[in-house]
Amino acid sequence: RYTDNEIADRWFSDMYAAETCINRYFNGRLMPQFPFEAMTSAALNVGCTDLWWNKKERHFTQIYREAQAQHWPAMCHRLPDFRYSAGKPVLLPRRLREEAWCLQH
């Protein structure tokens, strides 16, 4: 069992890693606030590498490409691409909420 301080430390560390990922790989420093927050949420849930690299097809993801081009609305619309866990689209409600949040910019 974790203490409250251990939970807080892990949360801080995980959030910092997700924000660093978005800044490093997705032009996060140039991104409007709402897209940055939505992408950070996705990175926290999906993992940094899986958000920018398609391991199965061995190429950059479309969401990564849109971020590189600073096409923020197009990037936001790619969030639902990451809806699967264990082969089932159980993450779709979360991704749709992130997409809606992202598009508020």
Regions found by a protein language model. Name each.
Residues 1-4:
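Acidic/histidine-rich, surface-exposed loop or edge segments in extracytoplasmic proteins
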Residues 6-13, 19, 48-105:
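Long, amphipathic alpha-helical surface segments
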Residues 17-57:
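Active-site nucleophile-His-acid catalytic modules used for acyl/amide transfer and hydrolysis
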